[in-house]
Regions:
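Conserved G/P- and acidic residue-centered "switch" motifs that form tight phosphate/ATP-binding loops
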Residues: 114
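N-terminal beta1-alpha1 cap of cysteine-dependent amidohydrolase-like domains
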Residues: 1-111, 122-124, 129, 133-171, ...
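Hydrophobic, aromatic-enriched interface-forming segments
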Residues: 117-119
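A short, structured beta-strand/loop element
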Residues: 213-215
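Active-site-proximal beta-strand elements of phosphoester/diester hydrolases
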Residues: 217-220
Length: 261
């Protein structure tokens, strides 16, 4: 059995720092891939159509789609124009949306968090509430940015896991406490997506892709935050890492067989 660690791609956000544009990924995501999933993180620049997706996927054993301060541009799901001042990242959209679709179809394990969760819904034809706190009957799922990070990322509400679903199998519970740092949320659920968890106000908090043999899970909360201190978050990243290792074994075994032939 190979002892090599799986290579896990993490698409970057594009942002301005001083006068220059940078491609960046939050350290907490990189650390979660390395320490909790047991993979080798590979940062993928947000180059849109310049990314050679087919070639890239041959080099990857998994993909983590992260959260971000930016929102998916609404034209991707036929939504109304965003309010002035809304932060968008069109270069990330142009990279992650086609990359995620291709990865899932190719059987590459995918774990999507927060913005990544929203991207997965859009990829499968779903739509988003841009401000879920303004929807009647929904609670405010945003963090209080005036508080220290420890409090912003603290658990704030429960989510109920679908009976017999993947999350219940992984976490051994029907109810868990999660943090909440989002304004966008699922409006219309995408095709092929199966709900794995909901908040008490009915907001979808997790789903998986139904008809794929590989790991393809998305959560609205942030399990990457202090992941090594949270058994439930460790279980999620552990399952993702296991799927990536299995993908790596299958791919390398196939490559060896091809070389022998």
């Amino acid at each position: 059995m190979s002892t090599e660690k799986p290579v896990i791609g993490i698409p970057a956000c594009r942002k301005r720092i001083a006068p220059h544009m940078f491609h960046a990924v939050g350290e907490k995501y990189i650390a979660a891939v390395a320490n909790a999933a047991g993979g080798v993180p590979l940062l993928i620049p947000a180059l849109g159509g310049s990314v050679a997706i087919a070639a890239l996927l041959k080099s990857l054993d998994g993909l983590l789609f992260t959260g971000s301060p930016s929102n998916v541009e609404p034209h991707h799901y036929d939504g109304d124009a965003s309010e002035e001042g809304t932060l968008h990242d069109p270069h990330r959209d142009a990279t992650t949306l086609p990359l995620m679709a291709a990865a899932i179809e190719a059987g590459v394990p995918v774990f999507a968090i927060c913005r990544g969760f929203q991207e997965m819904n859009v990829v499968f034809g779903g739509s988003l509430h841009q401000k879920i706190q303004d929807v009647p009957g929904k609670m405010d799922h945003r963090e209080d940015s005036s508080k220290p990070l420890e409090l912003q990322y603290a658990a704030t509400h429960q989510v109920r896991l679908s009976e017999g679903g993947l999350l219940e199998q992984l976490l051994g519970s029907r109810v868990i406490e999660v943090n909440s740092l989002h304004s966008q949320g699922v409006d219309r659920l995408g095709e092929r997506l199966v709900i794995e968890a909901t908040a008490d106000d009915g907001v979808v908090e997790s789903f998986r892709v139904a008809d794929t043999s590989s790991f393809a899970l998305a959560v609205q909360w942030h399990p990457e935050w202090q992941v090594m201190k949270n058994p439930q978050s460790l279980a999620l990243f552990g399952a993702f890492g296991d799927a990536c290792r299995e993908r790596a074994r299958e791919t390398r075994s196939h490559d060896l067989d091809s070389a022998v032939v």
